[in-house]
């Protein structure tokens, strides 16, 4: 990829899943146009908007006004913000709101928020009336480049993260890049971890481009739109090849096995660790573990660590505030990972930058020894 110098321009990424194909629109001003974009694609004229207490005061009125202008009747539900909202209790609250609004199969549930709202709303949309239409309006960088695309929905339980859910593809994704201007630096950095992930999976040129252009991505404009579009295209390619995560789609979990265990270890307390930060630490650990297994050069892990550290992300377990439980407890969380098959641990490892692969024969003893070595005791 070359340096981006042109003015911001809207981008469209098509996810070609046959009859369930959908568009991802990326650019400024999309919330104001949401009603028109939805009306041209969906037959229904009712929508239930699900959002949270942080997003609602900023964007809910603009979205509902846009829906009204397009002739779409809407209701809204405002939920508490944070990872703990991804629960059975709140899932039932969303389902009740959707049914109370008499949303039918051709009508839509609209997720206005970050990954938590998208995952929760998508789950409800997938099970109410055995499936209603679903529109994602992601308001964080992380949700724009990752969780809003691909149809994975779910909630957390005390057993772990995202262990209960369904696949339910959206009918449209509206990634309004203007909303990113209201994110805190911490939130934006957390989303950037998922952007970098796509380069580390199988696009080394993209990772190198990010190393050279990350400041322009952070400052906005054309480079930001280009990075989001490239990320969405990368995810679309993987989803189309393996929609149900039976094979190569597991690559999208690079850094997530370690990251999810760290999130569980912090009780999903966003004051200590948010998802993207867990992924950043997890990606560094995945590269270091690959080096430990003589699969990759230690220089690759150092390069990943250096870039993520440069943009301000945590890269070590010791960067997480407060005490962590022992390595054995982290190991228990890893054993609950949804990629575990027949009791065998499955990790996304790497042979170098952009050379990730699925390893389903990783010895538990090696993982535990590695965690003990990296644990900030």
From Swiss-Prot:
It comes from the Bacteria. It is found in: Cytoplasm. Pathway: Metabolic intermediate biosynthesis; chorismate biosynthesis; chorismate from D-erythrose 4-phosphate and phosphoenolpyruvate: step 2/7. Binds 1 divalent metal cation per subunit. Can use either Co(2+) or Zn(2+). One of its GO terms (biological process) is aromatic amino acid family biosynthetic process. InterPro entries: Dehydroquinate_synthase, DHQ_synth_AroB, DHQ_synth_fam, DHQS/DOIS_N, DHQS_C. GO terms for cellular component: cytoplasm. GO terms for molecular function: 3-dehydroquinate synthase activity; metal ion binding; nucleotide binding. The keyword Membrane does not apply. NAD(+) binds at residues 115-119, 139-140, 152, 161. Zn(2+) binds at residues 194, 256, 275. Keywords: Amino-acid biosynthesis, Aromatic amino acid biosynthesis, Cobalt, Cytoplasm, Lyase, Metal-binding, NAD, Nucleotide-binding, Zinc. Catalyzes the conversion of 3-deoxy-D-arabino-heptulosonate 7-phosphate (DAHP) to dehydroquinate (DHQ). This is 3-dehydroquinate synthase.
């Amino acid at each position: 990829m070359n340096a981006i110098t042109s003015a911001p321009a809207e981008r469209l990424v098509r996810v070609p899943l046959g009859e369930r194909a959908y568009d991802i629109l990326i650019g400024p001003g999309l919330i104001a146009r949401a009603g028109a974009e939805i009306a041209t694609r969906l037959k229904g004229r009712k929508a239930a908007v699900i959002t949270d207490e942080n997003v609602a005061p900023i964007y809910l009125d603009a979205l509902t006004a846009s829906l009204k202008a397009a002739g779409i009747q809407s209701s809204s539900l405002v939920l508490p913000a944070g990872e703990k909202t991804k629960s059975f209790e709140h899932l039932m609250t969303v389902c009740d709101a959707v049914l109370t609004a008499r949303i039918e199969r051709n009508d839509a549930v609209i997720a206005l928020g970050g990954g938590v709202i998208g995952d929760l709303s998508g789950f409800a949309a997938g099970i109410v009336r055995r499936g209603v239409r679903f529109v994602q309006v992601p308001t964080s960088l992380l949700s724009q480049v990752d969780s809003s695309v691909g149809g994975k929905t779910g909630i957390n339980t005390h057993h772990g993260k995202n262990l209960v859910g369904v696949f339910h593809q959206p009918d449209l994704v509206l990634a309004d890049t203007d909303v990113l201007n209201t994110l805190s630096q911490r939130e934006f950095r957390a989303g950037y971890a998922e952007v970098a992930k796509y380069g580390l999976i199988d696009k080394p040129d993209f990772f190198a481009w990010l190393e050279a252009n990350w400041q322009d991505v952070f400052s906005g404009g054309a480079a930001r739109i280009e990075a989001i579009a490239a990320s969405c295209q990368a995810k679309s390619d993987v989803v189309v090849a393996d929609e149900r995560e039976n094979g190569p789609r597991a690559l999208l979990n690079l850094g997530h096995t370690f990251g999810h265990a760290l999130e569980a270890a912090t009780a999903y307390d966003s004051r200590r660790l948010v998802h993207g930060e867990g992924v950043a630490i997890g990606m560094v650990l995945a590269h270091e573990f690959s080096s430990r297994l003589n699969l990759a050069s230690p220089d690759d892990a150092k390069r990943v660590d250096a870039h993520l550290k440069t943009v301000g992300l945590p890269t070590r377990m010791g960067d997480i505030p407060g005490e962590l439980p022992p390595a054995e407890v982290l190991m228990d969380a890893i054993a609950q990972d949804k990629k575990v098959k027949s009791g065998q641990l499955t990790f996304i490892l790497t042979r170098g930058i952009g050379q990730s692969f699925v390893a389903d024969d990783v010895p538990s003893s090696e993982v535990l020894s590695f965690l003990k070595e990296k644990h900030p005791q």
